[in-house]
Regions:
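Short beta-strand/loop element within the Bergerat-fold HATPase_c
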Residues: 136-147
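Conserved catalytic submotifs in the C-terminal HATPase_c
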Residues: 95, 100-110
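Glycine-rich ATP-binding loops of the HATPase_c
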Residues: 198-206
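Conserved micro-motifs of the catalytic ATP-binding
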Residues: 68-75, 110-115
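Short alpha-helical segment of the dimerization/phosphotransfer core of two-component systems
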Residues: 45-54
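Short helix-loop "hinge" at the ATP-lid/N-box region of the Bergerat-fold HATPase_c
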Residues: 129-130
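Short conserved segment of the HATPase_c
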Residues: 157-171
């Protein structure tokens, strides 16, 4: 556990270094009046945007660093009801990007689990699925036996890349850039939470239709 914390903090420090360096260089050039940086009207808004990105990153890092600090007691929940609530915002996001979102749940699905951490883990799985699905493709959420399945149609990810996706701040070549919202923490958070709850999961490519399938065993 301590090694994992050290690795996370090392990765976080490295991740923050680049935007801090860029912001410092931009401000320094503005102060010195170097070339194009004399145009404050252009570069002050850019600096503000960098600060907002840094603020968001720091918030995510702090929230992620606290994942293992508290333990929520398991309780009886209706997973179907919980999933319907969790999926609602992602259905709206999907619709806005012309992505079809299929939700097929039983009327009730009782389970005993920590609702807060489980909800956060599933939300990150859903966010990841919608983020990497192109317009005209489908995200499907359904129960299969005692398993929650989240599928999204996309270019399947190679096995050697899948393992690294659960490392903090890892972004493969096909991943979105930081500017478009990806921070490389989503699946790291999923792994941390599900592992802490002793909930098995798998993340594997699909052949037909091509895509990825995230399965959580309840």
């Amino acid at each position: 556990m301590e090694r994992a914390k050290v690795d996370f903090l090392r990765a976080a420090s490295h991740e923050l270094k680049t935007p801090v360096t860029a912001l410092n260089a931009t401000l320094e050039n503005m102060i010195l009046g170097v070339g194009k940086y004399q145009n404050y009207a252009t570069y002050l808004p850019e600096c503000k945007e960098m600060v907002e990105q840094l603020s968001g990153m720091i918030h995510e890092i702090l929230e992620t660093s606290k994942l293992n600090l508290t333990a929520e007691a398991p309780k009886q929940v209706d997973v179907s009801e919980l999933l319907a609530e969790l999926c609602e915002p992602y259905q709206l996001i999907a619709a806005a990007h012309q992505i079809m979102f299929s939700l097929d749940l039983p009327e009730q699905f009782p389970a005993t689990l920590p609702a807060g951490p489980f909800s956060k883990a599933v939300s990150n799985v859903l966010a990841n699925a919608v983020a990497y699905t192109e317009a005209g493709k489908v995200v499907s959420v359904y129960m299969e036996g005692r398993s929650l399945v989240v599928e999204n149609e996309c270019q399947p990810i190679p096995d050697d890349e899948i393992r690294r996706l659960f490392e903090p701040f890892y972004r493969p070549d096909f991943s979105r850039s930081r500017e478009s919202g990806g921070n490389g923490l989503g699946l790291y958070i999923v792994n941390t939470l599900l592992t802490s709850m002793n909930i098995p999961y798998s993340f594997a490519p699909m052949k037909s239709p091509p895509g990825m399938c995230f399965t959580i065993q309840l």
